[in-house]
Amino acid sequence: MPIHSSRPTRLARHAMIAAILLSSTSPMPAVAGGVTGQATEWTQLANNTELISLVGKSAEQVNNQITQISQLAEQIQNQLNIYRNMLQNTAQLPNHIWGQVENDLKNLQNVVNEGQGVAFSMGNVEDVMKQRFQSFAEMKSNLPDGASFSTTYQNWSGTNRDTIAGTLKAANLTSEQFSSEESTMSSLRSMSESSDGQMKALQVGHQIAAQQVAQMQKLRGLVSQQMTMMGTWYQSEQAQKDLAQARREQFFSGTEHDIRGGQTMEPRW
């Protein structure tokens, strides 16, 4: 999927961040940095108006995270290529260099996990929005065959996992060998004992890093489409009615909530 070329409107970006905040009420995997980690700080914000009042504070958060993941994958890809060239000119990489290889491959694992975490979170966005707003639930996506974003993110994740598994299988390796930090280190220690093992690890890592760069481009395109759809919904007449109703409900409830270190947030309309 190509990267969406048009820049989202300010309202579209705002709607996306509101959706991310809404998704914080659903379970999410722990992902370092990024959207899922920050969203968990707002799990107390069950009121729709409070959630919307935080819109715009982190408008580019999702795209920035995807960019960072993609850049790290590309850096790892380039570094592993350097190690491959070094290995071609020597019998075996010395221990201190192999230690750097192990660190890069562990970082590559984190790249995969963070990408999966973003897809999981953004899939939750649509589900939660449909639960909160009937007008959003009635909107049709602009995806092929009218597929939901939630299902499309699941398909993206499944394809990513299958591609990695296929790459490992081609090298007579399995996903189970790299399913945890402990098993990964054990596998890498075993592969480090020979020049052939080192080269195999470098080639597989290089392939997976290249795949992640391509997968992040697809994920960015999917997020861009979702932002566009949410911007369209946010600007619709029915959405404004839904949000106005949420404001009235909060006004008559007369309640306030402390947010993030005691700072009181009030909706601004």
UniProtKB/Swiss-Prot annotation:
Domain of life where this protein originates: Bacteria
Keywords: Conjugation, Plasmid, Signal
Family annotation (SUPFAM superfamilies): Typo IV secretion system protein TraC (SSF101082)
Signal peptide start-end: 1-32
Record InterPro entries: T4SS_TrbJ (IPR014147)
Signal keyword on record: yes
Protein's UniProt name: Conjugal transfer protein TrbJ
